[in-house]
């Protein structure tokens, strides 16, 4: 959505002032799979949200944005100055044009390319529409040492209220896209084509192993009393619920576009307006700022600025 947090705030203000329909393009919010996972989450299946883990990895040149520039691209057929816009001026370079995500002067790295999809999907499922209050990040350029200045390994930890959200992104090892939402009543694990829910009871199912240090008589008394108090009646024992949902092959980009067109026609709300998109992008900007500053950063909602 934006190259900086200030860009995002300007888009939000422009959308509000113009009263135009604006749909931000992170298409996870139009995913049928995530909509089904949201139903499970909203049912209270995992209980209070305690923590979230998000991860994704690539391991190929194209995935690391080493795109080939168009053959014959030259200043004679390409308006380089207009393409640069407000970015620092530099001589025409077809590599910079093709691989713009690699440099902070033009792009936002793995955070803006990949993290935003994970974060917006998590926000959609969990019903979050705010930027994280704090963020810390680490990583580095460890695989693709091609002159880029954006990290190809980027780890971040966010705080959404009391909920920590851990994000792992790498361009050096292929790993499946994964979202884990964890609560005291269960785990909801969302992958690219399916999700799994497994319930948890959150109680001891046997006497504590700590009693191994008790004298024999005390241990016997403790274990006898424990079983009297906790053992279920016959046929009443806890059975963990499990659910695996596999959706059909599904492209969430087309319905995301359709949702926008329907909103233009009917004036109904879109699934991802400028405010939601700005909040998702803010997390990515915070991850980048924390990485480059090597320090904790915070979000000031009143001014839409990153501090640290």
Predicted regions, residues:
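Active-site rim elements
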Residues: 24-26, 70, 105-112, 140-145, ...
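Basic phosphate/pyrophosphate-binding loop/patch that engages nucleotide-derived ligands
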Residues: 13-20, 36-50, 68-74
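C-terminal helix-rich "cap/oligomerization" subdomain common to oxidoreductases
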Residues: 149, 226-232, 237-250, 254-255, ...
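Rossmann-like dinucleotide-binding domain that binds NAD(P)(H)
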Residues: 81-164, 171-174, 275
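Beta-strand-loop-alpha-helix segment that lines the small-molecule cofactor/substrate pocket
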Residues: 1-30, 44, 294
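NAD(P)-dinucleotide binding in Rossmann-like oxidoreductases
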Residues: 146, 157-251
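Flexible glycine/proline-enriched surface loops and loop-helix/loop-strand junctions
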Residues: 20, 64-67, 99-108, 241-242
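Core domains of carbohydrate- and sulfate-ester-processing enzymes
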Residues: 54-97, 199-231
């Amino acid at each position: 959505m934006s190259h900086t947090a200030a860009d995002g705030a300007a888009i939000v203000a422009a959308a509000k002032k113009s009263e135009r329909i604006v749909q931000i393009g992170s298409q996870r919010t139009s995913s049928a799979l995530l909509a089904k996972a949201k139903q499970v989450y909203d049912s209270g299946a995992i209980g209070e949200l305690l923590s979230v883990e998000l991860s994704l990895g690539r391991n190929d040149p194209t995935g690391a944005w080493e795109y080939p520039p168009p053959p014959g691209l030259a200043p004679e057929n390409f308006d380089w100055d207009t393409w640069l816009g407000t970015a620092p001026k530099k001589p025409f370079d077809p590599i910079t044009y093709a691989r713009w995500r690699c440099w902070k002067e033009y792009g936002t790295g793995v955070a803006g390319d990949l993290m935003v999809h994970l974060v917006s999907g998590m926000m959609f499922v969990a019903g979050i529409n705010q930027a994280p209050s704090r963020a810390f990040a680490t990583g580095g350029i460890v695989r693709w040492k091609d002159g880029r200045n954006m990290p190809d390994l980027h780890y971040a930890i966010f705080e959404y209220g009391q909920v920590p959200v851990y994000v792992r992104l790498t361009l050096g090892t292929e790993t499946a896209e994964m979202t884990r939402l964890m609560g005291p009543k269960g785990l909801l694990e969302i992958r690219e084509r399916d999700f799994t829910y497994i319930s948890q009871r959150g109680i001891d199912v046997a006497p504590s192993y700590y009693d191994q240090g008790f004298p024999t008589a005390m241990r016997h008394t403790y274990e006898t009393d424990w079983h009297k108090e906790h053992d279920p009646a016959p046929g009443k024992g806890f059975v963990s619920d499990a659910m695996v949902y596999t959706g059909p092959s599904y492209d969430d980009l087309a319905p995301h576009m359709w949702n926008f067109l329907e909103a233009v026609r009917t004036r109904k709300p879109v699934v991802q307006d400028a405010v939601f998109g700005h909040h998702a992008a803010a997390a990515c900007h915070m991850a980048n700022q924390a990485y480059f500053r090597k320090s904790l950063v915070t979000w000031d909602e009143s001014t839409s600025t990153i501090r640290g």
